[in-house]
Regions:
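Short amphipathic alpha-helical segments that mediate assembly, nucleic-acid/protein binding
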Residues: 6-10, 47, 73-77
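Short, hydrophobic-biased segments on the C-terminal half of alpha helices
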Residues: 48-52
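A short, conserved structural fragment
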Residues: 56-66
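Short secondary-structure boundary micro-motifs
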Residues: 36-37, 43-44, 80, 91-92
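Short amphipathic alpha-helical interface segments
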Residues: 1-42, 53, 64
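Short, amphipathic alpha-helical interaction segments positioned at domain boundaries
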Residues: 70-118
């Protein structure tokens, strides 16, 4: 799956997910025209693409236990990507995002600069 999301789909996803946990971002990581063979692997790829874009655009920061993660955006993203589950079973109905194995959660940066810790 190379053509991840159209720009309007990305904006719709961000609008729907803003202020919510990364589990919500994963739930919304589906194209409007979902192929019949759409798999968790496809959803995972979209989620990671969206996460990286949100980080690079400054729309979210990653934090754990009330503290922002150390390192560059690239380092944080690579850390997250390296441990992100490869199967739906490993996500465990979204519980993985709240487990110690998850490197961090989303802190949304709103247009006015205020932060929403999710």
């Amino acid at each position: 799956m190379r053509n991840i999301l159209k720009e309007d789909e990305y904006k719709e996803l961000v609008s729907a997910a803003e202020g919510q946990t990364l589990d919500a971002v994963l739930c919304y990581s589906v194209p409007n025209a979902r192929p019949s063979d759409f798999s968790f692997s496809d959803r995972r790829e979209i989620f990671l693409w969206v996460l990286e874009r949100l980080l690079n655009e400054g729309k979210i920061k990653l934090a754990k236990n009330g503290k922002f993660l150390d390192g560059t955006i690239d380092e944080q993203f690579e850390c997250f990507k390296s441990v992100f589950p490869k199967t739906e079973e490993e996500i465990n109905d979204g519980i993985w995002f709240f487990d110690e194995l998850c490197p961090g959660g989303a802190v949304w940066v709103l247009d006015d600069g205020s932060l929403v810790w999710s």
